[in-house]
Amino acid sequence: MDIGTAIYERFLQGEEQALDELVNLYRNSLTSFINGYIGDYDEAEDIMIDVFVDLIQKRKNFKGNSSFKPYLFSIGRNKAYKHMHGKSRQIFISIDEVADFLPSDDPSLENDIIRQIQNEELNKAIADLKSDYREIIYLMYFENLSYDEIAKVMKKSTKQISNLAYRARQSLKGQILKRSENYEQQQNQ
């Protein structure tokens, strides 16, 4: 049993402090996840609060058969979709989130500028992916969810997620190579 499930079980048994622990444990990652769909952090925070209100109102819906985090994120995903009804689906990933995944040994100004450019290019490459690809990249690399957990969030089989993850990585690699080639061509002109 994962920590989220254990805390939620305590909440179901009447320990109100457990809800505070759940909120503290998941609020930032859930808000960032929702923000990836709607692109407005303030609205994402409101939706995150709605997710926890749903947990209070619908206490018995989580069966405990799996990890709590995918259950929570699927509620967040559904609420984000409802919020965006009629809007285009685009996942936004902040440069700060992307920056954590790029290496940097030298904190010099030049390296910081190069890193920022790399972050912007990576962010643009991710934004150019199909929505399912953007979503799976976010869940894998920014939320560190397993294929099984992602399958629950995206309501697909684990095999579909495995295939989708492969295609998403290939597509992202293609986007990055394309951008790199365009950059080199511009430098040679």
Regions found by a protein language model. Name each.
Residues 12-13, 39, 50-67:
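Sigma70-family region 2
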Residues 1-29, 174, 185-189:
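N-terminal module of bacterial RNA polymerase sigma factors
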Residues 6, 10, 39, 92, ...:
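C-terminal edge and immediately downstream basic/flexible tail or linker adjoining helix-turn-helix-like DNA-binding
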Residues 99-127:
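Acidic, proline/glycine-rich intrinsically disordered inter-domain spacer in sigma factors
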Residues 23-41, 58, 126, 175-178:
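Amphipathic, Lys/Arg- and hydrophobic-enriched alpha-helical face
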Residues 46-53, 66-78:
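Structural recognition of an alpha-helix C-terminal capping motif at a helix-to-coil junction
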Residues 60-63, 74-95, 115:
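Arg/Lys-rich amphipathic alpha helix in sigma70-family domain 2
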Residues 125, 133, 142, 148-179:
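DNA-recognition helix of helix-turn-helix
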